[in-house]
Swiss-Prot record:
It comes from the Bacteria. NCBIfam families: PRK00197.1 (NF001221), proA (TIGR00407). GO terms for cellular component: cytoplasm. Its EC number is 1.2.1.41. GO terms for molecular function: glutamate-5-semialdehyde dehydrogenase activity; NADP binding. The gene is proA. Its main location: cytoplasm. It comes from Clostridium perfringens (strain 13 / Type A). This is Gamma-glutamyl phosphate reductase.
Length: 415
């Protein structure tokens, strides 16, 4: 076991105990200090981010991934503001969600408490570093971060700044830490750090999620992989459908709530596809379509079986013509990742059937999948989008970083 993991694990465990009973004011003061320090030391962050970008460009990293990695003054301000916004959210810790009395006179309550020490493994998104720190701090959890090698310089600087801010705020050393060793061996050991980690949350592409699920012995909350579909029903508004798919695919193609597949009812395909594909191509999207799609719009690439299950995270879209709503639902439930799915239709009964039968964390009617986000749902910042069913599902805000403690009041009862 890597010595860095043991040292940081012990520090995190100690910090989590102190954080578990820190007051809301103490935690909020820490968050405001973090926000202030991030803005004050923006130039230091950008200097380190420049190093990461230069390395990524040398490696031939895609433009979409470079966009996830890149920071500028506006993005750093946005990150800092997101941290400050967490102060405005209600502190769930200590909340008694229910209280009931037993016939023997015992009063039993259910209280929200921190999870303890949260481990987060993620890829080339430096904003995750600050988001995760803020959410864990607000909920009284210590956090150990393991970012990707692509953003190591940016992440180390951000955590250094966060640590300095927490020290000034009087919060414990070890509240927010990051692994400096980004090797796969250390990552695997991190996934098995059961003596110190209470939960592990991976954020990234399918490869990362699979590696964590297959190797971790620490309990995992699976997040992130988004093979999201937009289904255009035969009773869809054409203009609305075009607007939704263009937004869902191109507004930020490298995020997990971006659309990766477009399914079109055969009754509307000849009218809809030429307009939609033209609009998508104008945004630089490569179309990979089924044979029926290619028969309608010839100037596209043919999709393979592999395409239907793939999360591109790029300016690529799979397009398939389907017979009806039932085939669309069947296709989504077969190839989807239970993240976010959307139907565009004017038919109420079709929309209700879609909502009921599609198995996903977020199911939309006449809206872009890009709204699956803690901020857009009104939860504030998020730790990720859970695609599993145990503990948490969908955008994970503050409450999803807590667990229950039963508190029992008696007056001498014995059994």
């Amino acid at each position: 076991m890597n010595n860095e993991l043991i040292i940081k694990g012990k520090k995190a465990k100690e910090a989590s105990y102190t954080l578990s009973f820190a007051s809301t004011n103490e935690k909020d003061n820490g968050l405001l200090k973090i926000s202030e320090f991030l803005i004050k030391r923006c130039d230091e962050i950008l200097e380190e981010n420049k190093k990461d970008l230069e390395k990524a460009i040398e490696k031939g990293t895609s433009n979409a991934m470079l966009d996830r990695l890149k920071l500028d003054e506006e993005r750093v301000k946005s990150i800092a503001n997101a941290v400050a916004d967490v102060v405005k959210l209600d502190d769930p810790i200590g909340e008694v969600t229910s209280m009931f009395k037993r016939p023997n006179g015992l009063r039993i309550g259910v209280q929200r408490v921190p999870l303890g020490v949260v481990g987060i493994i993620y890829e080339a998104r430096p904003n995750v570093t600050a988001d995760a720190a803020a959410l864990c701090l607000k909920t009284g959890n210590a956090v150990i971060l393991r970012g990707g090698s692509e953003a190591i310089n940016s992440n180390l600087k951000i955590v250094e700044i966060i640590s300095d801010a927490l020290k000034e705020a009087g919060l414990p050393e070890g509240s927010v830490q990051i692994l400096e060793d980004t090797s796969r061996e250390t990552a695997t050991d991190f996934m098995r750090l059961n003596d110190y980690l209470d939960v592990l949350i991976p954020r990234g592409g399918a490869g990362l999620i699979k590696a964590v699920v297959n190797n971790a012995t620490v309990p995992v909350i699976e997040t992130g992989v988004g093979n999201c579909h937009i289904y255009i029903d035969d009773e869809a508004d054409i203009n609305m459908g075009v607007d939704i798919i263009v937004n869902a695919k191109t507004s930020r193609p490298a995020v997990c709530n971006a659309a990766e597949k477009l399914l079109v009812n055969e009754k509307i395909a000849e009218e809809f596809l030429p307009v939609a594909i033209k609009a998508l191509k104008e945004k630089g999207v490569e179309i990979r379509g089924c044979e029926k799609t290619k028969a309608i719009v010839n100037d596209i690439n043919l999709a393979t079986e592999e395409d239907w299950g793939k999360e591109y995270l790029d300016y690529i879209l799979g397009v398939k013509v389907v017979k009806d709503l039932d085939e669309a639902i069947s296709h989504i439930n077969k190839y989807g990742t239970k993240h976010s799915e959307s139907i565009v239709t004017k038919n109420y009964f079709n929309s209700e059937k879609f909502l009921q039968r599609v198995d996903a964390a977020a199911v939309y009617v006449n809206a872009s999948t890009r709204f699956t986000d803690g901020g857009e749902f009104g939860f504030g910042a998020e730790i990720g989008i859970s695609t599993q069913k145990l503990h948490a599902r969908g955008p994970m805000g503050l409450k999803e970083l807590t667990t229950n403690k039963y508190i029992i009041y008696g007056n001498g009862q014995i059994r």
